[in-house]
Swiss-Prot record:
Major subcellular location class: plastid
UniProt name for this protein: Maturase K
InterPro entries in alphabetical order: Domain_X, Maturase_MatK, Maturase_MatK_N
Keywords per UniProt: Chloroplast, mRNA processing, Plastid, RNA-binding, tRNA processing
Length: 503
């Protein structure tokens, strides 16, 4: 944000905080280009760094100044004179530049809020693994959890409307609407993985989708505030108790349908926990399923009335944490009892007591992971390793580095797994697939290739963490062995690997 503060001060004084004129500034596209170059190595570099140049940017801005080029009929959309032969490149440049512009209000709001609250920036909280210590601390005390799939908006206009609260410039919203209408299919959000979240325009559409999700989450804050008001008010003032008990005799659906505005006042709000990543969220509670069904109804009703999305109640699954596991962020988590026996001595009598405590168990999803490996041709559907034929043309070191990198990323991400046996099986599949790929390249058998290369080839698949722990803590000690196999949460994981994301 600091890198273009100087540019913004000049534009603010001249344009009164309008964002629309920034689309004609060359430094906006330069910033978008630099951000593409500085992406994390874990992500694909999808920027236009090899095609972009200052001359192309100047040509694009000069064409945008000619407003008649923006007036394009629907019938003539295939022969767009504005983009010409550089249609894909120009549209990508505009989308990435516009993403930088729209991020400005959000960045300014974040900076001002941090300054007001004097909050110290903690980049560790950005790690995906920071959610699991929260699970370990809160979820063992809860009873029910709602597995919620946030519906996709059926129309791009909904995404544009969600920005109107933060972007006060109508011209920018009109430009975004025109850009989306002319160069993208309005119905592509129904199948987001195919077109709208294409890698070439991922930044802009992720920004729009995140603003849409923030709008969806606003109802949770509203319901929480409404329910908290009940704690400060006497129940006798709010309603008559006889009428209340009459209502709960009827089915939950009738109560909600007949008394929608007042339903919030009939139940005390218990300890609610909410977490979300991408389009999946979990709403956990300590109370009865009746309250969870109430929250379920409000979410579905909010989607239908505010976003005009016909959401089926089946997108929200209510499960009991002690009996069902939930899949979140690639881990299969469940709450299981941890029983410990305590011996108590009282004078001459001694007796044993069972102390039962709930504990979060995070497991490695072996079956979905084998399915992910089978899709990218590392093994078959049964988990039998096969050679990666598309990599056979690469050098030996390149092939080994690719397999080792995949194994290290999986070991790093699943370091918090309660049981590592399934993870070791996946690493075995990767090792044998690497050997088979090398043997295929050299037209040899696996046994012959291993004899020629030696066992040091497989040592490459040990991660740096495993090597350090094996040196510091020998496995002869049972205590250190349990520590070696314990769960470790890292604070540098900012994204999910494609193999981890099974959906």
């Amino acid at each position: 944000m600091e890198e273009f503060q100087g540019y913004l001060e000049l534009d603010r004084s001249q344009q009164h905080d309008f964002l629309y004129p920034l689309i004609f500034r060359e430094y906006i596209y330069a910033l978008a280009h630099d951000r593409g170059l500085n992406r994390s190595v874990l992500l694909d570099n999808v920027s236009y760094d090899k095609k972009s140049s200052l001359l192309i940017i100047k040509r694009l801005i000069s064409r945008m100044y000619q407003q008649n080029h923006f007036i394009i009929s629907v019938n003539d959309s295939n022969q767009n004179k504005f983009f010409g032969y550089n249609k894909n490149l120009y549209s990508q440049m505009i989308s990435e530049g516009f993403a930088v512009i729209v991020e400005i209000p959000f960045s300014l709001r974040l900076v001002s809020s941090l300054e007001e609250t004097e909050t110290v920036k903690s980049y560790n909280l950005r790690s995906i693994h920071s959610i699991f210590p929260f699970f370990e601390d809160k979820f063992p005390h809860l009873n029910y959890a709602s597995d919620v799939l946030i519906p996709y908006p059926i129309h791009l206009e909904i995404l544009v409307q969600t920005l109107r609260y933060c972007v006060k410039d109508p011209s920018s919203l009109h430009l975004l609407r025109l850009f989306l209408h002319e160069y993208y299919n309005w119905n592509t959000l129904i199948t987001p993985k195919k077109s709208i979240f294409a890698k070439s325009n991922q930044r802009l559409f992720l920004l729009l989708y995140n603003s849409y999700v923030c709008e969806y989450e606003s109802i949770l804050l509203f319901l929480r505030n409404q329910s908290n008001h009940l704690r400060l008010t006497s129940s006798g003032i709010l309603f008559e108790r006889i009428r209340f008990y009459e209502k709960i005799k009827y089915p939950v659906e009738e109560v909600f349908a007949n008394d929608f505005p007042a339903t919030l006042w009939f139940f005390k709000d218990p300890f609610i926990q909410y977490v979300r990543y991408q389009g999946k969220s979990i709403l956990a509670s300590k109370d009865t399923p009746l309250l969870m069904n109430k929250w379920k109804y409000y979410l579905v009703h909010f989607w239908q009335c505010h976003f005009y999305v016909w959401s089926q109640p089946g997108r929200i699954h209510i499960n009991q944490l002690s009996k069902h596991s939930f899949d979140f962020l690639g881990y299969l988590s469940s709450i299981r009892p941890n029983i410990s026996v305590v011996r108590s001595q009282l004078l001459e009598n001694s007796f044993l007591m069972d102390n039962a405590m709930k504990k979060l168990d995070t497991l490695f999803p072996i079956i979905p992971m084998i399915g992910s490996l089978a899709k990218v041709k590392f093994c078959n559907t049964s988990g039998h390793p096969i050679s990666k034929s598309s990599w056979a043309d690469s050098s030996d070191s390149d092939i080994i580095d690719r397999f080792v990198r995949i194994g290290e990323n999986l070991s790093h991400y699943y370091s918090g797994s309660s049981k590592k046996k399934s993870l070791y099986r996946i690493k075995y599949i990767l090792r044998l697939s690497c050997v088979k790929t090398l043997a295929r390249k050299h037209k040899s058998t696996v046994r012959t290739f291993l004899k020629r290369l030696g066992p040091k080839l497989l040592d490459e698949f040990f991660t740096e963490e495993e090597q350090i722990f094996s040196l510091l803590f020998p496995r002869t000690s049972s205590t250190l062995k349990r520590f070696y196999r314990g769960r470790i949460w890292y604070l540098d994981i900012l994204c999910i690997n494609d193999l981890v994301n099974h959906e």
